Amino acid sequence: EEIVMAKKKSSIPESEENNVKVLNEELVDITEEVKKVREQIKSFYDVTTTEEIEVPENLIDQVIGQDHAVEIVKTAAKQRRNVLLIGEPGTGKSMLGLAMAELLPKEDLEDILAYPNPDDPNTPRIRTVPRGKARLIIDEHKAMAKKQEETKRMILFFVIGAIVVIALTQGQLLWGLFLAVIIFFGMQTFRIKNQVMIPKVLVDNSKWDHAPFLDGTGAHAGALLGDVRHDPFQSGGLGTPAHERVEAGMIHKAHKGLLFIDEISTLKIQMQQAILTGMQEKAYPITGQSEMSSGAMVRTEKVPCNFVLVAAGNLETLRDMHPALRSRVRGYGYEVYMENSMPANEENIKKIVRFVAQEVKKDAKIPHFSLDAVAEIVQEARRRSNRKNHLTLRLRELGGMVRAAGDVALSRGDNIVTVEHIVEARKLSRSLEHQIADDYIDRKKAYQIFGSTGAQIGKVNGLAVLGEGSGII
């Protein structure tokens, strides 16, 4: 309508009418494309909203557009191989890592305990037991200690009572009370030393019904490799035993499971070397990570850490990653490059529709989408791909628009998300670069440097391309 009105106001000659008609036909084609997508969706699903679309239960089946990576992950999980995932943010690397943990064979998980070492207190002994047995062992030791404590308390009261009675009969009550106090504190010291023999559970796998999954992204050395807590009281019998201060790291908690590390190149080289050592020897001792701590004097026996490593990052990760660690992954696993887009065919459009249903179900707070709204999301995926006849696979950002549209619908009190909500959400979920570019354009409009509506003979505007995730190029 704006084009037709501009044509009348400008009195565009007949020679220029064809150009206006072509532009108008292109606008009509875009609308027809949305209708075409909607009809395709209706042919896939005999539904009216995404609420009726079935979402797969298995996490690996919820991965969208990464067919090659899914096949590699299935093979790696079956054979317990390491995997290095390289790709842009939001393409499903973390989801693949979590899905792989569900696919790992259910081996006999083990609990890990730390025992005191009478020969060398600063080298606690490490023992493994079947899953769920560690707590039983601790309960047995506590019950035994409690029984011994009750017996000693009875003996203590008997001895103190006997001393007081004898002191009264001999007329030496003051000396009797003094002796009773000495015996009382002596028994307390013996009780403290006796409690040292109770072991500590380092890894408790009783809560896992499948292979453990640990996300070590951004973890510091102590959390990843284990640590020994500082003890301010190191003498006089008041210090905490070394084995009770030992804390297991993620590489130990992931024993017979999976350790996922995103942006692995951000880890220090020393930490990458330690991870490599743990992968090679399938065991790694725990020691204090701070040289200023008393825990630095403690170094346990080797703690089992037979884990599968799934590392992720971008292309720069390959440059900063420890060469030996990458070689270990390649030698005992796979390297996978994540796709950024997929062809806009019927099968992949169906996947985007299922993705919308998955996001709504996962969020559990936003309403479901109408078919017209889903068709608009498909068109948004086409626009964000920055590639002809393709759909984007940066689904985290696309999911952000889905949630934003749901929030708009909720704010208006609507039970179904429509195209109108998506149009409003597109404005709300713009990137910072997009917002800055729009602000710049509005400022320039005030000075009439260029026009953005209508048609005018003899005036030419510069071409500005607004790419997804960037400003004006």
Residue ranges and their predicted role:
Residues 1-4:
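Short, Lys/Arg-enriched N-terminal segments with co-localized hydrophobic residues
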Residues 6-11:
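Short Lys/Arg-rich cationic patches that frequently serve as NLS/NoLS or arginine-rich RNA/DNA-binding motifs
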Residues 19-346, 354-406, 411, 415-416, ...:
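Conserved ASCE/P-loop NTPase catalytic core
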Residues 418-423:
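Long, K/E/R/D-enriched contiguous segments that form extended
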Residues 425-429:
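Terminal C-lobe "cap" of eukaryotic-type protein kinase domains
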